[in-house]
Amino acid sequence: MEKISASKLLAGLVPAGSIPEEVQVESVTTDSREVRPGCIFVAFPGEKFDGHDFAAKALENGAVYVVVNHPVEGVPAEKAILCPDSYHAMMVMGANYRSQYHPRMVGVTGSVGKTTTKQMTYAALAGFGETIKTEGNQNNELGMPRTLMRIGSSTEYAVIEMGMSHAGEIDRLARAARPDVGIITCIGVSHIGNLGSQENICKAKLEICAGLPEGAPLVLNYDDPFLRKAKLPEHVRPVWFSLTDENADVCALSIRQETDGMSFVLEDQEKGTFVVRIPAMGRHNVANALAAYCAATRLGCDPHGVIKGLSNFEQTGRRQKVVHSKGVTVIEDCYNANPDSMKAALAMFREFPCKRRFALLGDMLELGELSREAHEELGRLAAESDLYCLVTYGENAKRTAVVAAAKGVKTLHADSYREAADALLDRMESGDALLVKASHGMALEKVLEIFYAEQKDAEE
């Protein structure tokens, strides 16, 4: 964050003229341990700690103002910014700060693939100038303002991920960020328990248009039936990408899966035909790459430079990260999971070159009433994925195991991380491959920690 006057940063939260013009803000924090002279401390009430208990101490440590939901003992009225909703305060400050700078910005949302698409878009743009992106899971009403406050006078591009669990959230994020280009990767069933239907999820994702200017490109997946039939706002310019239809603005042809990535021919009706290779597995990642390409080129970046950037893409966390360990190939994809991403991962894995295929699949969380049906469908998909052995973990994944076993798949349900790791260690051989996928809350990385440690001990 670069220095900004408190009056500009707090506009909309305080009456005009109530903040002395000479007061400067050097940072904004919600963590009392990070309070420094010149900062604004935002108090959030929490289950374990209430930030209001640290507001007075924050002023002692140099904070110029504290944002609080109510008057706090020890905090002078002239130092308190009263706001009943701390998230709203963060969003207002993020929007005010962002308005001081003019990077070319891409906003990314969608039910599946938005984080990977964000990473790919960052890779596509980074070669053209200083670029920032959303880090980790900072894609909500607390994290996105923090990302906006990382923009500086030298920032040329910004890639902002926008997540949501309820209608209206992306509208607020988009209006604060004001991207130049929007991306919607696809419409799945994540958060369907909150929104009721995929049609409503589609409407919620389209809220990104609220922050797009007149004539802005909106990059959309032509292969998604909900997006294709959606009524788009008149002020945006759709840019369609597809893996199946050559009539789309940008499509992928001759798609091939290799041992460490995907290759394909990219046909852009506006800019020509190019050969592309990405270090990411699966057709779904080809779609993510097309979305990133569309956004970067419609911002005016040269296609050749964009494609070079995509070839250097680096995945974050355990998202289809390929690890070679003692002769076994492990595809770590345990950061998140839903029915759409599970289907894509199994489709990728079925084409993965190896001796025998093993899968460790865990629960998909937050599916509400769809959970039972989704986990049974996962069992049917697993049975069609040429697996040598399926190991499941989690209460919901028991249904997956039952259905897969009934269809002839060699199946084992584990009740602990140790049991899951042992089941794999006892059965896997050099040349085999393992897909590990579940929702992040299932913590299947703990199985991998045991698995790798036991492999190492066996070698020693």
PLM feature segments, named:
Residues 68, 73-77, 183-330, 354-355, ...:
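Acidic, Mg2+-coordinating active-site environments of NTP-dependent enzymes
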Residues 81-85, 411-420:
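Short acidic-hydrophobic, aromatic-tinged amphipathic segments that line or gate anion-handling sites
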